[in-house]
């Protein structure tokens, strides 16, 4: 089968002819329709320090996808041939304390599709049936293909009550932008998102952000004053992993504010803990998606009118995958979709 793989420990992704994956008793075989390129895939392409420590070579990569069930393991119930599915990319052990308590997103033995095991940049993918999620008919293939990062946005945004609250989002990557759209959809008052990438900030404006702030040109506290905010942000969503962005968030949070952190700093990050302590801030780390409450929320948000379509900015045939990676690496894109049909 046709696939995209990390073949060598150097920059790049390569088209290969890979063996069709074999299905176990509890697995589904999925024929891939569309995949999306994740920031993680760009890290793997660039072969940065994280990738060198994490990614086995050679391996088929990719983990954002939608496809059709074409094979069902003999122990599987609840799926049929032809079902349209996406899937949770974190494969969990089922045996640790968190898994047995239903907190599978906190499994300490997680393996990642396209990170630790064969991924979805291929004509066929095998995953445990437990990880598959049926896509409602009224949700497009494009949006189904980005359920994985959309889930990161939903999990982060819905960590705290947002109704009538003022929200600061640091980092206008696709996940941060989708989080802004979610916050507005569920009833936040002001949703302010910060970055230095004008292309992405304009996307955030299209997706409903109250203000999209280029912090290289504008002062965040001036923006707050323009909006009539006198006390600070109630909720912070840190999506960038940039220390300066987190410092700005701590400076502008209201007392008793709540912060959800999805962005991963490049190394250890020193902060002024007195701001956390004296403001009485709550900080919550976010990893992946809650299985499968986040997935149900994603489908429900889209079915209730949340419009994510502007976040998908580029489409390519899989044979033109290099153009897709070039678009993602340029920073001048939202989500990039590769078609496998």
UniProtKB/Swiss-Prot annotation:
<feature type="active site" description="Charge relay system">
    <location>
        <position position="43"/>
    </location>
</feature>
<keyword id="KW-0963">Cytoplasm</keyword>
<feature type="binding site">
    <location>
        <begin position="262"/>
        <end position="264"/>
    </location>
    <ligand>
        <name>NAD(+)</name>
    </ligand>
</feature>
<dbReference type="GO" id="GO:0019518">
    <property type="term" value="P:L-threonine catabolic process to glycine"/>
</dbReference>
<dbReference type="InterPro" id="IPR036291">
    <property type="entry name" value="NAD(P)-bd_dom_sf"/>
</dbReference>
<protein>
    <recommendedName>
        <fullName>L-threonine 3-dehydrogenase</fullName>
        <ecNumber>1.1.1.103</ecNumber>
    </recommendedName>
</protein>
<comment type="subunit">
    <text>Homotetramer.</text>
</comment>
<feature type="active site" description="Charge relay system">
    <location>
        <position position="40"/>
    </location>
</feature>
<feature type="binding site">
    <location>
        <position position="96"/>
    </location>
    <ligand>
        <name>Zn(2+) 2</name>
    </ligand>
</feature>
<feature type="binding site">
    <location>
        <position position="107"/>
    </location>
    <ligand>
        <name>Zn(2+) 2</name>
    </ligand>
</feature>
<dbReference type="InterPro" id="IPR002328">
    <property type="entry name" value="ADH_Zn_CS"/>
</dbReference>
<feature type="binding site">
    <location>
        <position position="38"/>
    </location>
    <ligand>
        <name>Zn(2+) 1</name>
    </ligand>
</feature>
<feature type="binding site">
    <location>
        <position position="200"/>
    </location>
    <ligand>
        <name>NAD(+)</name>
    </ligand>
</feature>
<feature type="binding site">
    <location>
        <position position="64"/>
    </location>
    <ligand>
        <name>Zn(2+) 1</name>
    </ligand>
</feature>
<feature type="binding site">
    <location>
        <begin position="286"/>
        <end position="287"/>
    </location>
    <ligand>
        <name>NAD(+)</name>
    </ligand>
</feature>
<dbReference type="GO" id="GO:0008270">
    <property type="term" value="F:zinc ion binding"/>
</dbReference>
<keyword id="KW-0560">Oxidoreductase</keyword>
<dbReference type="GO" id="GO:0008743">
    <property type="term" value="F:L-threonine 3-dehydrogenase activity"/>
</dbReference>
<comment type="pathway">
    <text>Amino-acid degradation; L-threonine degradation via oxydo-reductase pathway; glycine from L-threonine: step 1/2.</text>
</comment>
<feature type="binding site">
    <location>
        <position position="195"/>
    </location>
    <ligand>
        <name>NAD(+)</name>
    </ligand>
</feature>
<feature type="site" description="Important for catalytic activity for the proton relay mechanism but does not participate directly in the coordination of zinc atom">
    <location>
        <position position="148"/>
    </location>
</feature>
<dbReference type="InterPro" id="IPR050129">
    <property type="entry name" value="Zn_alcohol_dh"/>
</dbReference>
<feature type="binding site">
    <location>
        <position position="93"/>
    </location>
    <ligand>
        <name>Zn(2+) 2</name>
    </ligand>
</feature>
<feature type="binding site">
    <location>
        <position position="63"/>
    </location>
    <ligand>
        <name>Zn(2+) 1</name>
    </ligand>
</feature>
<keyword id="KW-0862">Zinc</keyword>
<dbReference type="InterPro" id="IPR013154">
    <property type="entry name" value="ADH-like_N"/>
</dbReference>
<comment type="function">
    <text>Catalyzes the NAD(+)-dependent oxidation of L-threonine to 2-amino-3-ketobutyrate.</text>
</comment>
<feature type="binding site">
    <location>
        <position position="99"/>
    </location>
    <ligand>
        <name>Zn(2+) 2</name>
    </ligand>
</feature>
<dbReference type="GO" id="GO:0005737">
    <property type="term" value="C:cytoplasm"/>
</dbReference>
<dbReference type="InterPro" id="IPR013149">
    <property type="entry name" value="ADH-like_C"/>
</dbReference>
<dbReference type="Pfam" id="PF00107">
    <property type="entry name" value="ADH_zinc_N"/>
</dbReference>
<dbReference type="InterPro" id="IPR004627">
    <property type="entry name" value="L-Threonine_3-DHase"/>
</dbReference>
<keyword id="KW-0479">Metal-binding</keyword>
<comment type="similarity">
    <text>Belongs to the zinc-containing alcohol dehydrogenase family.</text>
</comment>
<dbReference type="InterPro" id="IPR020843">
    <property type="entry name" value="PKS_ER"/>
</dbReference>
<dbReference type="Pfam" id="PF08240">
    <property type="entry name" value="ADH_N"/>
</dbReference>
<feature type="binding site">
    <location>
        <position position="175"/>
    </location>
    <ligand>
        <name>NAD(+)</name>
    </ligand>
</feature>
<dbReference type="InterPro" id="IPR011032">
    <property type="entry name" value="GroES-like_sf"/>
</dbReference>
<keyword id="KW-0520">NAD</keyword>
């Amino acid at each position: 089968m046709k696939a995209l793989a990390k073949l060598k420990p150097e920059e790049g992704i390569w088209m290969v002819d890979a063996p069709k994956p074999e299905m176990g008793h509890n697995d589904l075989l999925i024929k891939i329709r569309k995949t999306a390129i994740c920031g993680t895939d760009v890290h793997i392409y660039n072969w940065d320090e994280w990738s060198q420590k994490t990614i086995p070579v050679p391996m088929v990569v990719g983990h954002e996808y939608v496809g059709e069930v074409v094979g069902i393991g003999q122990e599987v119930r609840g799926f049929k041939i032809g079902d349209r599915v996406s899937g949770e990319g974190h494969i969990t052990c089922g045996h640790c304390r968190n898994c047995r308590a239903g907190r599978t997103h906190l499994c300490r033995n997680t393996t990642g599709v396209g990170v630790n095991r064969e991924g979805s940049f291929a004509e066929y993918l095998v995953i445990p049936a437990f990880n598959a999620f049926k896509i409602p008919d009224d949700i497009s293939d494009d949006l189904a293909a980005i359920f994985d990062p959309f889930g990161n946005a939903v999990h982060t945004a819905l960590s705290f009550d947002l109704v009538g609250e003022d929200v600061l989002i640091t980092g206008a990557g696709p996940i941060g932008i989708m989080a802004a759209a979610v916050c507005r959809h569920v009833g936040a008052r002001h949703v302010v998102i910060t970055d230095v990438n004008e292309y992405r900030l304009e996307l955030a404006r299209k997706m409903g952000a109250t203000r999209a702030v280029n912090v290289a040109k504008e002062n965040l506290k001036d923006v707050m004053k323009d909006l009539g905010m006198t006390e600070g942000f109630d909720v912070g969503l840190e999506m960038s992993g940039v220390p300066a962005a987190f410092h700005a968030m701590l400076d502008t949070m209201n007392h008793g504010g709540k912060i959800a952190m999805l962005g991963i700093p490049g190394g250890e990050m020193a902060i002024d803990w007195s701001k956390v302590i004296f403001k009485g801030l709550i900080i919550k780390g976010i990893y992946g998606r809650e299985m499968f409450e986040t997935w149900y929320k994603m489908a429900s948000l889209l079915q209730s009118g949340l419009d994510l379509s502007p976040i998908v900015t580029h489409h390519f045939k899989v044979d033109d995958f290099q153009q897709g990676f070039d678009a993602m690496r340029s920073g001048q894109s939202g989500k990039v979709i590769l078609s496998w049909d």
